């Protein structure tokens, strides 16, 4: 039996006050968005899912390739949720629509979930100069980091590892530490980049790969001391609930 409201509560997301949520960082962003959609559906919320980059498309999602307000509204009325995006022919992935057009859709839904970053399924990343693609109208930014990067070399666990290596001032073979994760999560040159005035959360995914939860707890506690709300867990394990 699935527990609804689990990730909404875990990340302390006030969807009534802050309904537009952009997700950035490492692998797990799409899974988190789909999980949040499930929880929001259970609460009877109308949800639009979209992306400002690329995002894996679930064929079970009702897809609207148009930003026509009437068409999107009809799909939301019928299904309660909709993916609004173009589809890339070669990859079959959802791809970005114009940001101004996306913004006009916000009044049609209760919550909008936007994947605003890419990581090629790597658990860790430091954004390039042109990243992340957080829309100006987003209320919340959630950064995702996979805890399976801990203790492993930067070159194996980071998307565009050279950016992470340069940012941390470590060589590519250096193992990722808890302190590295904290630095990446809180720096304006890391995953806090372009957050500005928005509400910010950090989700540490894949806690199930750890032998014990103390490293995750330590990171969450340290981030809290810096004023950042963070949580850890496992999207894979959550699917079994």
Give each language-model segment a name.
Residues 209-212, 227-241:
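Conserved GTP-binding G-domain of TRAFAC-class P-loop NTPases and closely related GTPase folds
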Residues 37-92:
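N-terminal phosphate/diphosphate-binding loop that engages ATP/GTP or pyrophosphate donors
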Residues 91-98, 106, 117-225:
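Conserved catalytic-core segment of NTP-binding enzymes
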Residues 42-47, 107-111, 195-196, 221-233:
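Structural alpha-beta junctions
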Residues 27, 52-54, 117-118, 207, ...:
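Short, ordered loop/turn segments at secondary-structure junctions
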């Amino acid at each position: 039996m699935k527990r609804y409201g689990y990730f909404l509560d875990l990340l302390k997301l006030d969807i009534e006050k802050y309904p537009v949520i952009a997700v950035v960082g490492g692998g797990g962003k799409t899974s988190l968005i789909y999980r949040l959609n499930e929880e929001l559906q259970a609460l009877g919320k109308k949800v639009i899912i979209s992306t400002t980059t690329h995002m894996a498309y679930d064929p079970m999602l009702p897809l609207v390739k148009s930003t026509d307000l009437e068409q999107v509204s009809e799909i939301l009325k019928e299904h309660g949720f909709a993916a609004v995006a173009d589809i890339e022919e070669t990859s079959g992935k959802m791809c970005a629509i114009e940001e101004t057009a996306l913004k006009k859709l916000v009044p049609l839904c209760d919550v909008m979930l936007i994947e605003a970053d890419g990581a090629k399924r790597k658990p860790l990343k430091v954004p390039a100069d042109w990243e992340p693609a957080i829309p100006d109208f987003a209320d919340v930014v959630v950064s995702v980091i996979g805890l399976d990067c801990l203790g492993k070399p930067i070159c194996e666990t980071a998307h565009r590892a050279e950016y992470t290596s340069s940012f941390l001032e470590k060589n590519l073979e250096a193992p990722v530490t808890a302190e590295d994760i904290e630095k990446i999560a809180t720096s304006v040159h890391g995953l806090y980049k372009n957050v500005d005035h928005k509400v910010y959360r950090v989700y540490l995914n894949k806690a199930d790969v750890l032998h014990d939860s103390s490293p995750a707890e330590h990171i969450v506690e340290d981030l809290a001391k810096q004023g950042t709300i963070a949580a850890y867990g496992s999207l894979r394990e959550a699917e079994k609930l």
